[in-house]
Amino acid sequence: MSKILEGLNPAQKEAVINYNTPSLIIAGAGSGKTRVLTSRIAYMLEQGVSAENILALTFTKKAANEMRERIDAMVGTAARRINMGTFHSIFARILRENAEAIGFKREFTIYETTDSKNLIKTIIKERNLDEDKYKPGMVQSRISTAKNSLITPGSYAANAALTGDDRSRQVPEFANIYLEYCRRCKQNNAMDFDDLLLQTNILLRDRPDILSQYQQQFQYILVDEYHQVLYRSIHSCKSTDIQQ
């Protein structure tokens, strides 16, 4: 028996060795979910799966570093070749590799929250809108919500229910602000943190050739703290249609 399986209970062992089938591990805090995930990756490497074919996504950078250290302790330097990181870091890498396909340059800037808010403030001021109604923080939050729901500016403007709700909230210009905000970001070769996931979805949706490339590369996807993952992140994973 592999040493990697030592100390695991029967259910944990089953989750580790059956790596060719999709698995969802549900258990309480402190029950060893992360240990199962790292053991599964280590076992896959031991069984001959190429590190380059594994994509491990985590909720935080700290979790990614800890997982890599654990796997390294079990199987050695092979762990360093695994594609592992947060959703934002992995998707930023994918976008930089394919930025031109969605109209950006590879060296695009990633806006911090303050950068985004300042741009929104500028747009509101240029349009002579009432800042008591169009509070920059509120507008920024609504733009983030739209992107989290995979709603682009064009789709938002074409959605009668959304624009009708804006009118009832007395912010009928929101769709135009959203559109202009995204236009300015692209003009400045910049994305905000929400764009890293939204634009990855757009890239994989609109470029089947690029999607196919990552389907072939990432043959195994493993997600830590799946319950905390945003819808658009899950959608990006599922769009690859490979082992999860």
Give the residues covered by each predicted segment.
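A basic/glycine-biased coupling hinge at the interface between accessory DNA-binding modules
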Residues: S2, N20-T21, A42-Y220, Q228, ...
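Conserved RecA-like helicase ATPase core segment
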Residues: S2-G7, K33, L37, Y43, ...
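N-terminal pre-P-loop "Q-motif" helix
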Residues: I4-N20
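Well-ordered alpha-helical segments embedded in enzymatic catalytic cores
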Residues: A11-E14, R40, Q199, H235-S236
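Small-residue (primarily alanine) positions within well-ordered alpha-helices
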Residues: A15, A27-A29, A56, A63-A64
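Hydrophobic residues on short alpha-helical segments
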Residues: V16-I17, Q140, C237
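Walker A/P-loop
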Residues: T21-S39
